[in-house]
Amino acid sequence: GLICNAAGVFFIYSANRVSNDVRRATFSPRELAELTMNFYRRNYIEGLFLSSAVVGSPDYTCERMIETLRILREEYRFGGYIHAKAIPGADNALITRLGILADRMSVNIELPSNNSLQTLAPDKTKESILRPMGLITNKIKESSAELVRYKHAPRFASGGQSTQLIVGATPASDYLIMSLSAALYKKYELKRVFYSAYIPVVENPLLPAKTTEPPLLREHRLYQADWLLRYYGFDANELLDEKHPFLT
């Protein structure tokens, strides 16, 4: 589910970025909740992934997401799975409320280095991403501890948190990407890092040409390497190094 696709921050690589002349769509919390329930009752879906561009401000956007989930959980008794994407810059109390209503949360890093963030997403900073990620990690730990003491304590994102990295939009190597993933798993105890092959949709000298094929094989190899990190305890340095920075 997407509350709004009108990007409130500037991402050079996004088809929905502020400067792109594309049609914007916005759902009210009630509309999105009703649409979700209609699909759920027909067994078309088993859950909801809720995301939004920033509308007005991070706090206002997060409040609209919370209201959507409140309607689903409290009024419609929606029993499906909910994955909510946290809004960087939103107040901690709002992110906490969102996490209580959702089964899993995510804060998407998108780009694997400070340089690429500054170049392609200048409105996004490392701190704006890692602050809510750290908050979610701490809230999950607090919730787990509370549930040991009180059976009916509210659950916070019981399915954990995840993030996403775009592959191929920048020159970042697989070694850099896997090193970042390993650090995120260790420090923030993420359940998953998802890798998404960059699909060129805009013309910009800072990006691969629109005729460039999406690096789907590279995406596949990163998922294979990620499996070794998560399930077999490998370190990124055991798979790659600066002399051999790519998996393929």
Please provide the spans of the model-predicted regions:
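Conserved Radical SAM active-site core
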Residues: 1-5, 10-163, 168-172, 202-211
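Extended low-complexity acidic/polar segments
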Residues: 96, 107-110, 175-206
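Flexible, glycine/charged-enriched surface loops at secondary-structure junctions
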Residues: 145-151, 195, 234-241
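Long C-terminal interaction/binding lobes of large macromolecular proteins
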Residues: 151, 155-157, 164, 175-186, ...
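Catalytic cores of enzyme domains
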Residues: 160-166, 170, 191-192, 198-200, ...
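Long, highly charged, low-complexity intrinsically disordered interaction regions
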Residues: 203-248
